[in-house]
Amino acid sequence: MLRIINTQINMSTDWILRVGDGENLRRSSKYKIWGIQTITSPHGKHFIKNVKHGDRLWFVKSKSQGLVLAVATYVSHNKREFGPLLNITMTNEELGWTGDGIDWTSDIEVHYTDLYNLTQCQLLTHIKGASTIRKYDDKCKVELPVEYNYILRYSKITLEL
């Protein structure tokens, strides 16, 4: 039984998601929802096509040498739906998100669980580039899969950031 569980953990993919200054993530963390753009972002499209249940989502602050704010476990995603009379999904206002511009608006909700607040850990990925979502690779200065094992061992799941 232990061998099967260990195999499942090792098959998880680590995804790095840039979250601006982190304030929108902090405000919506109580709902366990993050938003991504797939209409104009090839990185968002790639993520939606390849992410799977149990993958790890590393939320990283922009323009901070890649400061890791939190890690969570991916559960699912869905298209955000707003109607003239009734909204099927939560609005930006309900989630506490602020911002403007077409590139800012998220068309997909990403649902996660097991959120760990890492704001005090000073984990710096040092990843550069314009990509808002990417798979973990050797360009990352922190071995995220190794760190995740320590996080599981020494941290507690948080209800929100």
Language-model features and meaning:
Residues 48-61:
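Short coil-to-beta transition motif at edge beta-strands of beta-rich domains
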Residues 30:
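Dinucleotide-binding Rossmann-like beta1-alpha1 core, especially the glycine-rich loop
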Residues 66-68, 81-82:
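Short catalytic/ligand-binding loop motif for oxyanion handling, primarily in non-cytosolic enzymes
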Residues 19-23, 60-65:
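Short, flexible beta-strand-to-coil junctions
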Residues 68-77:
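Short beta-strand-centered aromatic/proline hotspots
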Residues 27:
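Short loop/helix-cap segments at secondary-structure boundaries that form the rim of catalytic
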Residues 2-24, 33-46, 80-161:
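Contiguous surface segments at macromolecular interaction interfaces
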Residues 52-54, 67-69, 103-107:
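Short connector loops at helix/strand junctions that flank enzyme active sites
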